[in-house]
């Protein structure tokens, strides 16, 4: 598969992507099973535990929900939001007991012969794991979907998406994350926002993300771990498209090359968005500025400012950057006449707004003038 991708000319990349779309029949079958699982998780999950609780909602994430699946391979997240989790600490300390209940429910579904796909729950799971993993596969087809089921604190409640969340949500997250000493443990709480961030993007961009993910899987097969998380490359692709012009129709090879060139410049990456949070709230602003001063690469989760998706994994980035540099010489980045594809002009960092010292200086001058004026009258 690697030989096939790197050998085709740049003009054929769109056709290559079409070949690697999931089959419609399996996708429809998968959607039906996911809907059944969501209903079961919503109505029956944790009702028979020692302390029965209500599931407020079930969020769907992963590539199967984002529309960026690969043929024969996909991943999905089912986030079970529980009413009994009233803070981040509850999610951290009590998720094990509820994940056991979820596992029991999945075993019941596994025994149901009316479901047209095979469910395989990973036996190596332990209560300390953040998620329960299982696989769905079609017996008559070489296709599977990897799932993670995660119990979570319903932080956002019934926030109307795409409305920007109340910044106090993030202030509370930052405060509790700091007191618990846990880095990026609560990204599951923001699944719906993460999904919205990608879902409204044009189809062509999702196809480019699919191509980048396919390339990443080839690298993983060749290099093994450690590598940067796949989500970091998805965000990097969105960033490249945004800074490259936000076109609904574009040259796929140019977009692909831009992403790989950004990977080779990983030591310079400083990327964040202000779609869900920004610098207006003083506590959030202070925390954001600290996050953005961390050693690069920095790619903040657009839904969760505590999550640096680029992570502290310089070795993984170095290995992936080496592979990206090698790929830039391959035919998939050349036109039929041999001329190389030019990347988009995309900066490696997003500017950080300066703190409003000027306003404070004006206030100070105004205060001094008032003292001088009223001081003279008082003499």
UniProtKB/Swiss-Prot annotation:
PROSITE patterns: 25A_SYNTH_3. This is Inactive 2'-5'-oligoadenylate synthase 1B. Residues 375-379 are extracellular. Belongs to the 2-5A synthase family. Signal peptide: none annotated. It holds the Pfam family NTP_transf_2. One of its GO terms (molecular function) is double-stranded RNA binding. It comes from the Eukaryota. Highly expressed in the brain, liver, spleen and heart. Interacts with OSBPL1A and ABCF3. GO terms for biological process: antiviral innate immune response; interleukin-27-mediated signaling pathway; negative regulation of viral genome replication; response to virus; type I interferon-mediated signaling pathway. Keywords: Antiviral defense, Endoplasmic reticulum, Immunity, Innate immunity, Membrane, RNA-binding, Transmembrane, Transmembrane helix. Does not have 2'-5'-OAS activity, but can bind double-stranded RNA. Displays antiviral activity against viruses via an alternative antiviral pathway independent of RNase L. Its main location: endoplasmic reticulum. InterPro entries: 2-5-oligoAdlate_synth_1_dom2/C, NT_2-5OAS_ClassI-CCAase, NT_sf, Polymerase_NTP_transf_dom. It is found in: Endoplasmic reticulum membrane. Residues 1-355 are cytoplasmic. GO terms for cellular component: cytosol; endoplasmic reticulum membrane; membrane; nucleoplasm. It is a single-pass type IV membrane protein.
């Amino acid at each position: 598969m690697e030989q096939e991708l790197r050998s085709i000319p740049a003009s054929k990349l769109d056709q290559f992507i079409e070949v690697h779309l999931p089959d419609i029949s399996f996708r429809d079958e998968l959607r039906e099973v996911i809907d059944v699982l969501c209903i079961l998780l919503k109505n029956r999950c944790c009702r028979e535990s020692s302390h029965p609780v209500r599931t407020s909602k079930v969020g769907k994430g992963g590539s199967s929900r984002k529309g960026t699946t690969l043929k024969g391979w996909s991943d999905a997240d089912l986030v079970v939001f529980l009413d009994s989790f009233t803070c981040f600490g509850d999610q951290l300390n009590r998720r094990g007991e509820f994940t056991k209940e979820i596992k029991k429910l999945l075993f019941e579904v596994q025994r149901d012969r009316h479901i047209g796909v095979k469910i395989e729950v990973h036996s190596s799971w332990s209560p300390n794991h953040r998620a329960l993993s299982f696989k769905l596969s079609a017996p008559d087809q070489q296709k599977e979907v990897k799932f993670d089921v995660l119990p979570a604190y319903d932080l956002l409640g019934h926030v109307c998406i795409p409305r920007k969340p109340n910044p106090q949500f993030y202030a509370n997250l930052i405060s509790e994350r700091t007191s618990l000493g846990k880095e990026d443990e609560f990204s599951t709480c923001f699944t719906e926002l993460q999904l919205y961030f990608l879902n409204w993007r044009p189809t062509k961009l999702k196809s480019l993300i699919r191509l980048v993910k396919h390339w990443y899987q080839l690298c993983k097969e060749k290099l093994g771990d450690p590598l940067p998380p796949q989500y970091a490359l998805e965000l990097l692709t969105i960033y490249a498209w945004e800074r490259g012009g936000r076109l609904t129709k574009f040259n796929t090879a140019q977009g692909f090359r831009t992403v790989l060139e950004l990977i080779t410049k990983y030591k310079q990456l400083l990327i964040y968005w202000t779609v869900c949070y920004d610098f207006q709230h003083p506590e959030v602003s202070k925390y954001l500025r600290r996050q953005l001063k961390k050693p690069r690469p920095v790619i903040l989760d657009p839904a969760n400012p505590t999550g640096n998706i680029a992570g502290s994994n310089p070795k993984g980035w170095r290995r992936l950057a080496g592979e990206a540099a090698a790929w830039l010489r391959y035919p998939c980045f050349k036109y039929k006449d041999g001329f190389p594809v030019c990347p988009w002009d995309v900066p490696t960092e997003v500017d950080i707004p300066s703190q409003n010292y000027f306003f404070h200086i004006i206030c100070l001058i105004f205060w001094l003038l008032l003292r001088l004026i009223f001081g003279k009258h008082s003499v």
